[in-house]
Amino acid sequence: MLVYVCLVVILIQLPFGAAGGAALGVIAKVSVDAALQQIDDVWKENTVRYWKCAVENRSTKTLYALGTTQESGSMSTIFADIPPQSTGVFVWEKSRGAATGAAGVVHYEYDNKILSIMASIPYDWNLYSAWANVHLSDHKKGFSDLYNGKNGARYPTRAGNWGNVDGTKFFLTDKSHAEFKVIFSG
């Protein structure tokens, strides 16, 4: 037996032109058992969604940990400074017991600039894809700017592809437990 799940998202034109008007309808077939298993996994906190990030600092200056911008989930490890010619590692995971992905931005200070690193791992791989982006600017970039490629940020790179933005190379695997490699040269 199959259940038809219909998701309709309608974006309404905002008065200040912040979003374009569009409608999207997506229909996906899901077996009843699979749907119930997903719900059960969320309640039992069995759903794995996280991104493990290794930031390689090839520059001559320290990357100072400046904080995070949470979209869904949070950092589950210590967020530390990264000295020159070193690599820092952290993990960002989804919120426990919630049907969300793992998405957010980490910020490092570098020589009066801010390096913002964004990744988004979806909860539902049938409807969404994983995305990554990096931006070096005078101020912190929020999740929305990096995810949508707005306010000076380039459009994000889909997981499974190398990105190269502002002298920073990065690669995000296309998995629910993604690995994110960032190579910062300064």
Curated annotation (Swiss-Prot):
Location of the motif Cell attachment site: 158-160
Signal sequence, renumbered to the chain: 1-21
Keyword tags: Membrane, Nematocyst, Secreted, Signal, Target cell membrane, Target membrane, Toxin, Transmembrane
Pfam families: Anemone_cytotox (PF06369)
Compartments, record wording: Nematocyst; Secreted; Target cell membrane
GO biological process: cytolysis in another organism; monoatomic cation transport; pore complex assembly
Annotated Gene Ontology cellular component terms: extracellular region; nematocyst; other organism cell membrane; pore complex
Single GO term (MF): channel activity
Entry note about domains: Composed of a long N-terminal alpha-helix and a core region rich in beta-sheet structures. Before the pore formation, the alpha-helix binds the lipid membrane, partitions into the lipid-water interface and stabilizes the monomeric molecule on the membrane. Finally, it traverses the bilayer, thus forming the transmembrane pore.
Stated family: Belongs to the actinoporin family. HALT subfamily.
Known role: Pore-forming protein that forms hydrophilic pores and causes cytolysis. Compared to equinatoxin-2 (AC P61914), it reveals lower cytolysis activity (5-12-fold difference, tested on erythrocytes), a larger pore size (probably 2-3 nm) and different affinity to membrane lipids (100-fold lower affinity to sphingomyelin). Binds to sulfatides. Shows cytolytic activity on HeLa cells, with a different potency than its paralogs (from most potent to less potent: HALT-4>HALT-6~HALT-1>HALT-3>HALT-7>HALT-2).
Subunit architecture: Octamer or nonamer in membranes. Monomer in the soluble state. In vitro, interacts with folate receptor alpha (of target organism).
Name used for this protein in its record: Hydra actinoporin-like toxin 6
Species assigned in the record: Hydra vulgaris
